[in-house]
Regions:
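Alpha/beta-hydrolase
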Residues: 1-55, 62
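Hydrophobic/aromatic residue at the end of a short beta strand that borders the catalytic acidic motif
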Residues: 7, 75, 102
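Short, conserved loop/helix-junction motifs that constitute active-site signature segments
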Residues: 58-60, 86-87
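Short beta-strand/loop motif that positions the catalytic acidic residue
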Residues: 60, 66-68, 72
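Conserved alpha/beta-hydrolase "acid-adjacent" motif
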Residues: 73-79
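Catalytic active-site module of serine/aspartate enzymes centered on a nucleophile-bearing elbow/loop
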Residues: 90-131
Length: 131
């Protein structure tokens, strides 16, 4: 658990720190859902071996919302900007102070962004009607 906590501290959001207690509670909950070190290793190899995919982004035809942390130490914000620019009609939201995580302090904001995106992009007949 200490290694996982250290990783979260490195990639986490500098403007939205979480307490040690909450950090360990979240790690414990994740471990209780399941842990597969071999699966993580396979995923890392797959990421490294997947190669360049930006040429595929212009072929995305569904509405896209790109949310990227301005303080992401793992994937530079320029990559999020490029991703949104390459997807036709994509909307970009750069969150100041956010790293490569979803801090509890931002969950409401992230959910609101996703909700607005989905409500605005769904066909009118698919939206739920008030009772």
């Amino acid at each position: 658990m200490a290694h996982m906590a250290a990783t979260v501290r490195v990639i986490g959001s500098p403007a939205y720190p979480v307490s040690e207690k909450l950090l360990y509670q979240r790690i414990e909950a994740a471990l209780q859902r399941g842990s597969c070190p071999e699966g993580v290793a396979r995923q890392m190899v797959a990421i490294a071996a997947s190669g360049e995919r930006t040429t595929l982004l212009p072929s995305i035809s569904c509405p896209a919302l790109v949310i990227h942390g301005a303080a992401d130490p793992l994937i530079p914000v320029a990559c999020g900007i490029d991703t949104a620019a390459l997807i036709p009609g994509a909307r970009l939201e750069v969150i100041e102070g956010m790293g490569h995580d979803m801090p509890p302090q931002l969950i409401e904001r992230l959910l609101a962004l996703i909700d607005v995106h989905l409500q605005g992009k769904m066909a009118p007949q698919m939206r739920s009607q008030p009772a």
